Amino acid sequence: MLASDPGSPGWPNEDFVCAGPGAAVLLDGATTVPRHADTGCEHGVAWYARALGTALLATATAEPRQPLAGALAEAIAQVRDQHKDTCDLTHPATPAATVTTVRAEPGGIAYLALSDSSVAADFGDGRPPLILTDRHRAARARPDAAADAATGMIPRAGLRGVALLSDGATRITDLYQLLPWPAVIDVIRDHGPGRLIRQVRAAEAGDPDGERWPRAKLSDDATALYWHLT
C-alpha cells in the first residue's frame, strides 16, 4: 500500500515511491535554494528523485547479493551519467534526495536510510515499532554519499510489515506530535497510508498561518508506503 500527496498545488510532487518484487524505495527530493532559483540542472528536483528511485529499485532487485549501499552508489552513478553532459552537477544547489529502501533477504529485511526519511519496522508481538532514520547528507551526484547511509537487517521473527515515510508524512508525530509512532503504524497498516496523509493535511489546514506549529513549509510533500509481510 502506498500514497503520496504534493504539498503545494501547481508544483510537482518531489517525493517518489515505488515497489517491485521483494523491494521498495521512497525518496524525498530536495535542493538548497528556493523554487525557481537556478540549480544547475535543467531537469529539476522531481525528475531527480524519480530517476534515482527508479534506478535504485532496478539495481537493488537485479543484484540481490549486493549490499543496498552498493546498489545506491550504482544508482547514483547511473543518474549522474544521464545528465552530466547537460547539467552542472558541481553546482551547490544541484538536486538531491533523501533515500529509504528495504529488500527481502534470507536473513530478514535489509534496510537503508539516507538523510531524514524513515524506515519503520512493525512487530506483531507487542513491541513498539523500530524507527530507523539517518541524518547525514542526502544523495546528489556523488556515489560515495551511499557510504553515509544507515544500513542493517531487521529480523523476520515477529515482523508484521515495514513502512517507509517521507518527512512530510512523519510531521504528524515529529512536528505536530498528534500521534505517537505506534499509532502512526496502526493507521497506515489498518487504514492505508492515504489516511495518515489526510490526517497530516487536516492538521495543517487547522494551522494555516503556522502559529501553532511554526514551520518553513506550511505543507510539504507527504508520502508513505506499508509492506505487509504476514
Task: Give a label for each model feature.
Residues M1-T230:
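PP2C/PPM-type serine/threonine phosphatase catalytic domain
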